[in-house]
Amino acid sequence: MKIQPKSGREATEAFLQGAGDVLLSYENEALFIERQGDPVEHVTPPHTFKIENPAAVLTKSENAEKAKAFNDFLYTPQAQRLWAEAGFRPVDATVAAEFSADFLQPEKLWTIADLGGWKQVDSALFAKDVGSIAKIYDAATG
């Protein structure tokens, strides 16, 4: 069966319904299904990618002050605990220590910068017909 889920959550749901033997997904998805009691084994590889979830405030927002306050709140210990409870790795060191059992530390967290930046990664992996992942995807679905 060939499927192309549109999101991490959709991929998780398809996996739990029997599509595939292994799911490569985001850490928060693994924690979500573990916390739901689904029969899965969550593996943190020794070398993996750091995926950041940025927030932005529009410079011309009519609610710029409130938006900035909300953005600032996201990094408070209170908000970081909420993020951690939802399965997202906290960036606050104190909160990270509180949730250390949930968020194992891999030997190496690669960043896009480690791989030459988005322009290089996008070309090498996703460029139509020549990117490594594009070719694998085309072979699997073509």
Go through the PLM ranges and name each one.
Residues 27-29, 51-54, 80:
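Residue-level signal for functionally critical sites in structured catalytic/ligand-binding pockets
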Residues 28-31, 48-49, 61-62, 88-89:
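Solvent-exposed loop/turn segments at secondary-structure junctions
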Residues 1-45:
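Ligand-binding pocket segment of bilobal, Venus flytrap-like solute-binding proteins
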Residues 6-9, 35, 50, 81, ...:
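Arginine residue identity/basic-tract feature
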Residues 5, 36-64, 68, 95-99:
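Periplasmic-binding protein-like
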Residues 61-142:
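Extracellular/periplasmic juxtamembrane helices and adjacent flexible linkers that interface
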